[in-house]
Amino acid sequence: MTNAFSDFAETMSRSSTSRNLPETPHYHRVAVLGGGEDARLIAALCLSEGADVTLFSAYGAELKSLRSSSGVTLRGAGPVGTYQVDRENVPSIKACAQLDEAVAAAEVIFLSGPVHKQRTYAMVLADHLSDGQVLVLAPGRSLGALETAWFLRIGGC
């Protein structure tokens, strides 16, 4: 039995190393929709990878709080540190209250927050999306992607 497993492992190793796997694209312009903790985390992680990041929130209180803070602080495993918001002459997250401005130049758009907010965004996003933009739902554990796709299709995407 050990020989059969060794043969299997060797065969799998050869087959997986001989394939040309597609290169992961690097996106430079990212929009994050939502002002909660998930959105702030995603924005800081994207900034830590060198992306130009715009964080959209329709709620002025969220943006005011974010702008008056020292930034978004990440601790633990992975990138750590404080990532600035709306600061001049340093890489920082751009906070924005206009949806069209937030998504216009984005290559990737992260849609964060609970399902009912994702639904609202999906209903208005169709008018603002362009061909080639990537839309990512975070979190994606609730079949919200199906509902979002449905609303986008109804909206003309």
Task: State where each predicted segment sits.
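Conserved N-terminal Rossmann-fold NAD(P)-binding element of oxidoreductases
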Residues: V30-G34
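Hydrophobic/small residue at the entry helix of a nucleotide-binding pocket
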Residues: E37-A39
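N-terminal Rossmann-like NAD(P) cofactor-binding module of classical short-chain dehydrogenase/reductase
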Residues: I109-F110
